[in-house]
Structure formats: C-alpha cells, structure tokens
C-alpha cells in the first residue's frame, strides 16, 4: 500500500510542474501521407517571445529522399493554442531556402512570436510539377518562452 505524506505530495507536484513548464521542441518529427518532416528551431531549439526564431523543416519522402522547397508549394501558418480548425492564422511567414551542413534548400522561415505561450506551426504542401509526393499537412506544437 502507498502512503502519501505532504512532503512526498509536494515533491511530486514540483516534479510534474517542472516537466510541464519545460519546452520540448527539439527536432520534432511528424508524418503526413508519404511525407515526413523534422522541425528545427534556432537559437538552441527554443523560441523566445519578441525575438526572431529561425525555423526550418526537413521534408523527406517515404524512404528518406529529401524534398527541397523548389519541389513544394509549401505554406506555413502559426496559430496560438488552443485554436479551432476554422481560425485565421496569427502569422503566415514567407518561406525561403535554408541550407545547413547536412541539408540543402529546405523550407525555412523567420518568425517573431508575439508573446510567451503555446503555439502550433502548420506546414502544408502540394507537389510542384515534376515532384512526386502526396499533399500533406504537418502540425508542430511550439512552446515560446521569455
């Protein structure tokens, strides 16, 4: 039988509150139809309110083949959380090519989140002429700190 004391209860409460308050955004992976996407946020995988966050998403087809921005009619939308499917996005940042040490010409954007809180980034895309992947929608939860 478990015996709970005030000290144990406060310890659990502290642990749970720390876990809930800690942003967990680093390299979030999602899949939609035959497209996978891995979100990356700079600086240091944490967005800060009022500061520019450099966001990019590595898109791959099933099997691992990279989908560059040049092959995708991609759109990025930022929603505050919670939101409804019919809500207008808070932001619709324009996408540009991002190249890193490992990836070339992937979709990226610079985003300034207006305040601390929970947001959802939604990347949708359809193939441009000559590309062969199914239309997709990838949604990523993002916690913005101060």
Predicted regions and their residues:
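Extended interaction regions within the primary functional domain
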Residues: 1, 19, 88
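Bacterial N-terminal signal peptides that target proteins for export
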Residues: 2-12
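Bacterial N-terminal signal peptides
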Residues: 11-21
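N-terminal soluble domains immediately following signal/targeting peptides that reside
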Residues: 23-146
């Amino acid at each position: 039988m478990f015996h709970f004391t005030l000290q144990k209860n406060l310890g659990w409460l502290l642990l749970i509150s720390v876990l809930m308050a800690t942003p967990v955004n680093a390299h979030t992976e999602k899949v939609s139809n035959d497209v996978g996407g891995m979100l990356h946020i700079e600086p240091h995988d944490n967005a800060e309110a009022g500061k520019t966050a450099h966001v990019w998403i590595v898109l791959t087809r099933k099997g691992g083949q990279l989908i560059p921005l040049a092959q995708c009619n991609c759109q990025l939308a930022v929603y505050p959380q919670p939101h409804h499917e019919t809500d207008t996005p808070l932001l619709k940042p324009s996408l540009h090519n991002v190249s890193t040490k490992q990836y070339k010409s992937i979709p990226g954007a610079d985003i300034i989140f207006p305040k601390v809180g929970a947001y959802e980034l939604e990347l949708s895309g359809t193939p441009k002429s000559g590309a062969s992947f199914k239309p997709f929608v990838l949604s990523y939860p993002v916690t913005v700190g101060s």
